Amino acid sequence: MQDRQKAQDYRALLLADTPLIDVRAPIEFEQGAMPGAINLPLMMDDERAAVGTCYKRQGADAALALGHRLVCGDIDQQRLEAWKAAYQRFPNGYLCCARGGQRSHIVQRWLQETGIDCPLIEGGYKALRQTAIQATWQLAQKPILLIGGCTGSGKTQLVRQQPNGVDLEGLARHRGSSFGRTLNPQLSQASFENKLAVELLKINARQTLKRWVLEDEGRTIGANHLPECLRERMAQAPIAVVEDPFALRLERLREEYFIRMHHDFTHAYGDEAGWQAYSKYLHHGLFAIRRRLGLQRFAELTDTLDRALAEQLSSGSTDGHMAWLVPLLNEYYDPMYRYQLEKKAANIVFRGTWQEVANWLKAQ
């Protein structure tokens, strides 16, 4: 049997969606983690902070002794049972701490004492993180084609249909606009970058890749920003622009923001709480751009939104939303995107309807 006690082939681990039993403190995990990792800490945040303070004041031996005192008895047993259960669930998993140091070795030794031989990641999360950063930089050097178009053009759907397409908005859990958030909270910046790196590695590994197909995005997608190496390449990339009829764009937006989001909120929270969350979501999206709309126009559109919500609640009809969505597109989103696109006019290589762009992509 191959010795798995330590792992250094980091790309292979990431490509395989290798389960990681991450024993870092919750605050470290929240700041950045790898896809597929589960957080079962050796020390909680307050315990880690106490050990860190002890290390600075009294040295490594005293800190280690304090750590053993903090994690003992019932606490020790509870955490050990959690690690055992995780390994039984993921027998191909690895232990991971910050740098492959004391914490993962301690947990590994405790598991060995129960008859479980769980390998660890040599270099820990830091090594995996560096691998992800390097992979993104390397793979971003491949040619890129952007899919552009005004809001409601179906760009994301088109990207998802491409074998070499990377759904940046899906990875970011955000659709890019002020109404772009989903029910799933966004990842931390580092976790988003790690997830992006793994996606790039996977797509690159399963085909002979000539170029990436990405949606034309700004620097940020919600709270996440694109890695600079990728953003720089996107700024110079050719663009295929989707130009669908306005009415078709409205129907896509109706389906995505009024029908699907209402369904998702009520499915997650129940009818009453879900309706309140859905209403709050739409109001928040409008509120986020109030200064750009002007406060008077914002107030007018908010009144229209309130009437549309009342109509939807009473009859189920989403038609009333068109009364604020149409001016929002005409006065804000469309002019903003067209202005941005004008600055990249030299990069445009094709224009057409959604289907025409899809056919053009197949022919490339």
UniProtKB/Swiss-Prot annotation:
Protein transport listed as a keyword: no
Catalytic function, reaction form: 5-methylaminomethyl-2-thiouridine(34) in tRNA + selenophosphate + (2E)-geranyl diphosphate + H2O + H(+) = 5-methylaminomethyl-2-selenouridine(34) in tRNA + (2E)-thiogeraniol + phosphate + diphosphate; 5-methylaminomethyl-2-thiouridine(34) in tRNA + (2E)-geranyl diphosphate = 5-methylaminomethyl-S-(2E)-geranyl-thiouridine(34) in tRNA + diphosphate; 5-methylaminomethyl-S-(2E)-geranyl-thiouridine(34) in tRNA + selenophosphate + H(+) = 5-methylaminomethyl-2-(Se-phospho)selenouridine(34) in tRNA + (2E)-thiogeraniol; 5-methylaminomethyl-2-(Se-phospho)selenouridine(34) in tRNA + H2O = 5-methylaminomethyl-2-selenouridine(34) in tRNA + phosphate
Annotated Pfam families: Rhodanese
Enzyme class: transferase
Catalytic residues, chain numbering: C97
Coiled coil feature spans: none
Segments forming domain Rhodanese: 14-137
Highest rank taxon of the organism: Bacteria
GO molecular function: transferase activity, transferring alkyl or aryl (other than methyl) groups; tRNA 2-selenouridine synthase activity
EC number: 2.9.1.3
PROSITE patterns: RHODANESE_3
GO biological process: tRNA wobble uridine modification
Function recorded in the entry: Involved in the post-transcriptional modification of the uridine at the wobble position (U34) of tRNA(Lys), tRNA(Glu) and tRNA(Gln). Catalyzes the conversion of 2-thiouridine (S2U-RNA) to 2-selenouridine (Se2U-RNA). Acts in a two-step process involving geranylation of 2-thiouridine (S2U) to S-geranyl-2-thiouridine (geS2U) and subsequent selenation of the latter derivative to 2-selenouridine (Se2U) in the tRNA chain.
UniProt similarity note: Belongs to the SelU family.
PANTHER family, alphabetized: TRNA 2-SELENOURIDINE SYNTHASE
Quaternary data: Monomer.
Stated name of the protein: tRNA 2-selenouridine synthase
Species name: Salmonella enteritidis
